[in-house]
A protein has these predicted regions:
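Pyridoxal 5′-phosphate
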Residues: 1-180
């Protein structure tokens, strides 16, 4: 999850889900006009709107999700406004709302990285605990993965939850590897 500049990377199409950045579970779609004009879309008979971007909608849009997605972006931009001075160098060529959003993402990334580093440093020497991820000093996300010898991930999550620490213990969309 990161900052994308569709113009800088000359993206034809970008799809995302706002739940990745504090919004609801729904889809968001960017498409260059010339690419969109060449795409066919499924249509319902009662809908004769053939112009982009409306022809990509297959029915009534869920306004609650659209509102939630917009508010998620507003949430990020608000954080960016409050922390813009921290990222003047990185955002020198940006202005307005784009700058606010980028500063918000950078502020959250910075905060999450600090928390993850604190966690990694705090647990790395626990006997029987194996920490997974890139070597120190290499780029990494704020995701911290570990196992504890002799315990399954569900039991670890329950023990931590009993102490007010909440972690994910699922298969992270890789259930087949757990079955093997």
């Amino acid at each position: 999850h990161g900052i994308i500049d569709v113009k800088a990377i000359d993206a034809d199409i970008v799809q995302t889900s706002p739940y990745k950045y504090y919004g609801p579970h729904c889809g968001a779609f960017y498409c260059k006009k010339e690419v969109g004009d060449s795409l066919k879309a499924a249509r319902v008979m009662a809908d004769d709107n053939t112009e982009m971007p409306f022809r990509m909608e297959t029915g009534t849009m869920c306004m609650e999700n659209a509102s939630g997605a917009a508010e998620a972006v507003e949430f990020i931009a608000d954080i960016g406004k409050r922390h813009a001075e921290m990222f003047e160098e990185e955002t020198a060529d940006l202005t307005g709302r784009r700058k606010d959003i980028v500063c918000g993402m950078l502020a959250m990334d910075t905060y999450e990285a600090q928390l993850a580093d604190k966690l990694r440093n705090g647990i790395k020497d626990i006997k029987g605990l194996k920490l997974y991820g890139p070597c120190a000093g290499t780029p990494q996300t704020a995701t911290v993965s570990f196992t504890v010898e002799g315990m399954n991930s569900n039991d670890i999550a329950k023990k931590l939850a009993d102490r007010g620490i909440f972690v994910w213990d699922g298969e992270f969309y890789a259930i087949a590897t757990i079955w093997e």
